[in-house]
Design a protein with these regions (language model features):
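Residue-level recognition of specific faces of alpha-helices
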Residues: 18, 31, 51-54, 147, ...
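Transmembrane helix boundary and interhelical junction motifs in multipass membrane proteins
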Residues: 20-28, 150-160
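Juxtamembrane transmembrane-helix boundary motif
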Residues: 1-18, 29-35, 39, 60-145, ...
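Membrane-interface alpha-helices at helix entry/exit sites of multi-pass transporters
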Residues: 38-45, 70-71, 166-177
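Early transmembrane hairpin of solute transport permeases
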Residues: 30, 34, 41-58
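Transmembrane helix-bundle signature of multi-pass membrane transporters/permeases
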Residues: 43-51, 80, 173-181, 206, ...
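Residue positions within transmembrane alpha-helices of multi-pass solute transporters
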Residues: 23-24, 55, 81, 85, ...
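Membrane-helix boundary/interface segments in integral membrane proteins
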Residues: 187-192
């Protein structure tokens, strides 16, 4: 595939997914592998571009005061601690059954996000203690599931923040982006210790990823309502659930 096509795809993925609290990795990694990039190159490039898009969007969300750091920090810490536990447990559980259950839960969350007509208040208050404890517990769940399945945990953050902690959708998406910055770059550092990335490609692609993250975050912050964000994210969840189902049955 020509770079004239690939680089706009990087921009588009960053634009769409940063609006809903993700960085683009759901698209980058399978796209690069489909284009027959070496696996380590595909994964490291995906993580780096994911981090760049998330960092770009996080700048906007912090300026708009949309990030809830009191939830984000304990979530980052606890998910980092529990991801190795999930990886260690991989050989001790029935992964096919666990993945099937997870896919079913994600499908339900996707349906609720897409079809729910319930309005929300962007001014709903949550106690500081509730935020810290809830963020820590959610981080444990996300880290464990991510380590167990070998997938990024970002796709779980937004629905858990919305439906468990009752965080307004826009705040949940912005806080998720803040978390994705740390998880992406830490994963990238681990991968470059194994294999050298294609710096020429990822630095050029990073310009498009950064631009997409800027545009996506500005559109979300200034134009999109919570209900619209939930529906876009629900569509992303639906695609992710179908990928998990494919992993179970194929």
């Amino acid at each position: 595939m020509s770079w004239l096509i690939l680089l706009p795809l990087v921009f588009s993925a960053s634009f769409v997914l940063t609006m809903v609290g993700l960085g683009g990795g759901l698209i980058f990694s399978p796209l690069f592998i489909l284009l027959q990039f070496p696996v380590h190159t595909a994964v490291s490039a995906s993580l780096f571009l994911n981090g760049v898009a998330a960092l770009s969007a996080a700048i906007t969300y912090f300026r708009k005061k949309m990030v809830d750091v009191k939830i984000g920090l304990p979530l980052i810490i606890s998910s980092s601690l529990f991801a190795p536990l999930g990886a260690y447990t991989t050989s001790k559980v029935n992964l096919r059954l666990f993945t099937a259950i997870l896919a079913a839960v994600i499908l339900l969350a996707a349906a609720r996000m897409i079809f729910s007509q319930k309005a929300e208040s962007d001014t709903k208050e949550i106690s500081t203690v509730h935020r810290i404890i809830g963020g820590g517990i959610i981080g444990m769940v996300i880290g464990f599931a991510a380590g167990l399945l070998g997938i990024g945990g970002g796709v779980f953050i937004v629905p858990l923040l919305i439906y468990v902690l009752k965080v307004p959708t826009r705040t949940a998406a912005a806080t998720s982006i803040f978390i994705v910055v740390f998880s992406s770059f830490s994963g990238f550092m681990a991968h470059i210790s194994i294999a050298r990335p294609d710096w020429g490609f990822i630095l050029l692609a990073a310009l498009f990823s950064f631009a997409g993250g800027q545009l996506g975050s500005r559109v979300m912050a200034e134009k999109l309502k919570g209900r619209t964000i939930r529906r876009i994210f629900g569509a992303v969840l639906l695609v992710f659930a179908l990928k998990l189902i494919q992993k179970v049955f194929l």
